[in-house]
Amino acid sequence: MSKELIEEGYTTWPRLIAELLKNKRTKDKIEQVAVGDELMTWRKALKHPAFTKWFYEGFGGADGCKFTAWSKEWVYFPVQYDGHESVGRVPRNPCAVSTEHFGGG
């Protein structure tokens, strides 16, 4: 079933985070995730129904749940531009890394 959903433009937050980590060529490990008002481990988040729910990532409304995820070096969060959903990240601690604009442009 997941192959058909992927072909139709559906995804989950864990899939989008994994794609981002692959594209950045990092072995970053997510330690904690807040889904709604619950803080949990990554392992528990992978079983949370809202976090693992399939949603349409294409243009339209924001369908994925709100979340914040932390690794040792980065903070991950949902990004939406014109209805398209993706994952953004910023450094967890102060450093000399500037943040690009999120969204369009």
Where are these regions (language model features)?
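N-terminal domain-onset segments
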Residues: M1-F55
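Generic marker of "main functional regions" within proteins
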Residues: I30, M40, P78-Q80, E85-S86
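Amphipathic, interaction-prone secondary-structure segments
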Residues: K44-G83
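Compact, glycine/acidic-enriched structural inserts
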Residues: G88-G105
